[in-house]
């Protein structure tokens, strides 16, 4: 057969779908009970979509196609996200001829040179990639209703008005507030950064350090060394301080409010602190070695403690000043032990080694399972020898911190007897009230780089607008909604619950980037994770909005709060529709239609996206829905998918290790790409794209096409007499239907592909082997029937070639709208399946005997099936599942008593193997029917149950495990 022209077939059916408007649902066609509304996070248009994105968008398309075939009225719309700073940042970098950016867009995304330089204008980037993304989705065969297409920002005024309405609504509820809050900040551009504005480090947490002001008296001056800690309660156990002798530190005037103090911190810390409500005036810079050997006073205990050298102190983490609590911090304990061995370092700084030798650890916390100094014990338990054992040290630290926080009891007055969790808060609060401690925010990991290419800092912003996700009443409603939602996979539910718990105020607007201006404060632009939470509701009316725009009958400015309130939040009212019609110029009937559309399609049945959006978009989606819509309109389910890698490596545009979705389609065909990414892993697991494997799959898909094309020429005559192997094939087809259906209902795409494609293909291969040489009406009936079912099972995964094959089969209309196969009751036949499994197993056993026994030129095999009494034992054991009960029952039978010892051994064996589900078959009948096939497969003569006991094997025969002698 000539190589299949995937592209020609794809273009043919994409054109036909578009012409027939197959995927534009009419709400009047089916009752609300038969509607199915599924959406996926719309793509951000800063570049081409890659094969990782392909997974995210193919999953909902497969589910949409499956539900459509099940008879549902399916809405699967698509829009485009262009809000925020990233696109503006790209334009800026192209304008500045940034080599890395130029490389990505010219060499990785293959943007023609003459178009690339137009990208200095962000709108040109949007225009180019919006067109490219839509073409990619069409080429992929996505069953999208394109009449509802839109994009975000003020560049699309109707949607912008919708977002204004959303924010007015939230503000009226007290959920959008103004105030001071910590945010990730680009210090060069001067803007807050949301998750989508971060190029590297978007998952990095912000930590809240307590900085405790240790006192250095020098030349009549009081200078503070603020030590940063996540465990303020351990200030009572400080034995020394750590500074990095090679790092640069500064002495600076630090002003906060009406207070001015002298601080010594790392140079990096001084810069970062300047963004956190402090004025910093650097007086001098010096190396940390200048302070080594000096003493500072603990502001809580009054103890004088020495400053010791430590290269492990990172000047770019918090203040660069670290307090040492060796009884409860494994790093501190091991650093002191190392220092005791390296006396030359101490002598370098004129420190008497005995000072370090005589440091006494201070025990603060009682912890079950540990003695006085848990850090020492844990380091010993994990075999930590020195600071070089970094992984073990980090594990020891995690173990101790976690155990002490959750189970530790404080021993030091005035907090003796209280849990560490409580003491931590009390100590921090008391120190801050006394002015001896403050808060500093720091990233848990580095680097955090904005999409402008700049290192981010944490800034305290005043007069910033926030969505108050910390509101307790709002959190309660979000939890209620989540509890009533289906989450796939269910294991992700705990992550959603945790995010709801820790979510707090989130900056929702910034001063730069594309977007919708905040309606009451237009200097601010609503950011990308805040204008993308309820657009699924907008899809329900966007067809009408788009039609009005097309006809020049829409004045978007007139789409005010009253209009959207009526559509989305109020009961039907003819009077209201008339008033709104007069106000907006939109016909009252159209307004009524819009409301009908929303009420029909909502609630959203499924929201799909990748797992990285759980801590932001997907949880914001829940919050905003419960705030704005009636409970009956709250979303019903979220499906979360994993990521993709390329040839075992994480995809990276900058390293060129990326495969564009459209290139994958060009290389392999859309159907092959779809089937490959759906069959590689379950939707919630990560997958790895391997070109070699895709090539193999292409050949299998071509074989599928070839087989069905041949079967399409057969006639399926009714009333034919089927043989057992024919019944087996139809039974297995039933199993494939059942398995694929169940898997798709649960978004288990890999399992669905296994059933719909590989299982049918493998079963068909076996059937063709078993029926080789036959060309009768029964076989033709089975193969023609199989083709009809198989094409429909494959339609959600490989829609283009399935349409082509459906046409060859003479199917009615589009296979995309054909009924999804259902198991045929009369096809079920567990007996023929058991018999066929028996035959397969026997063939493999005989092959193994020949190989293991090294029998050269075998001539014949003698097969002995189990006697009736052994089957009786199997049946009784299956019923009783207990040795004594089974033995008692069987010994009632005189025939069984003749085999007493053998019965006893057999019962023991069956119970040990838990062989309780053995299905009885007529083994001899199955063997005689398959005798010719077995002989052909093995190339030897088969003799079934002869009188003579060749090789004394007869007694070894067991139910479903015949005894075999080969000669």
Curated annotation (Swiss-Prot):
InterPro entries hit by this protein: aa-tRNA-synth_I_CS, aa-tRNA-synth_Ia, Leu-tRNA-lgase_arc, Leu-tRNA-synth_Ia_arc/euk, M/V/L/I-tRNA-synth_anticd-bd, Rossmann-like_a/b/a_fold, tRNAsynth_Ia_anticodon-bd, Val/Leu/Ile-tRNA-synth_edit
Keywords carried by this UniProt record: Aminoacyl-tRNA synthetase, ATP-binding, Cytoplasm, Ligase, Nucleotide-binding, Protein biosynthesis
Binding, ATP: 653
A GO term, aspect molecular function: ATP binding
UniProt motif ('KMSKS' region) ranges: 650-654
Enzyme nomenclature, EC number: 6.1.1.4
Enzyme class at the top of the EC tree: ligase
A cellular component term, taken from the record's GO annotations: cytoplasm
The reaction(s) this protein catalyses: tRNA(Leu) + L-leucine + ATP = L-leucyl-tRNA(Leu) + AMP + diphosphate
Stored PROSITE patterns: AA_TRNA_LIGASE_I
Main location: cytoplasm
Localization per record: Cytoplasm
Positions of short motif 'HIGH' region: 43-53
One BP annotation, GO: leucyl-tRNA aminoacylation
Aminoacyl-tRNA synthetase among keywords: yes
Family: Belongs to the class-I aminoacyl-tRNA synthetase family.
HAMAP family per record: Leu_tRNA_synth_A
Name used for this protein in its record: Leucine--tRNA ligase
Gene from which the chain derives: leuS
